[in-house]
Amino acid sequence: MFLQAFTTCQPEHGVADDMALHQAQRVRDSRGVPEFVFNPRLGETYQEALDVKGNPSIDLDWYETKNKVTGETSRYTVAHWCVTEARFRNHLKKLKPEASAKLIPLDNMLVRITQQDIVYRRYLTPGHRAFIPDFGVYITYEENGKTDYRALSRQLVMFCVERRKAWRMLQSKAGIVNREYIAQKAILADVDAGKLSLEELFARGHELVTERLAGAMAAKV
């Protein structure tokens, strides 16, 4: 049997001494280091031997958490985990709420970009759907009872894409179909075919994914 575990090095990571358990849970929930158990006694295929059920929302890219202040739901990505560790401070900038209007929500950005866009460096091409502006993407984060806004470096957005890809690979080995991945591929195919404009993709990326997921669920009923 193989078990994967994660723990912080508190001084190096910029984490309080009593937060090791919390950080391990956060990095798991953010898909930074997903939890899995590999037990070959269960069968002769990966689908039988690999267990990822310790992770939240196992058929989606990210899981949703509720803001204790506003009651609103948001997705917990690896960028949100990075906010909790001081070692990533150079990749995060605090924003005033009004300044976020000029930036791209991370949820929308992640629909626009794939791992192949990273490999072929399309994320550096202005005008391409996958272009990532440095500190031009933002997230909201609940801290000390209020909602904070953080701009992300280009490298941190790329980190989100890479961790999402790794999670999708792990899901597939465990025999889990990622519904968001299917929706994203369909949306980008429509963009490439001219059925969906770049303007709508940029403005409604995450909303389009949500609509596709709802439509797929309704079709099953």
Residue spans for each PLM region:
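A structural signal for short, well-ordered beta-strand segments and their strand-loop junctions
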Residues: 2-5
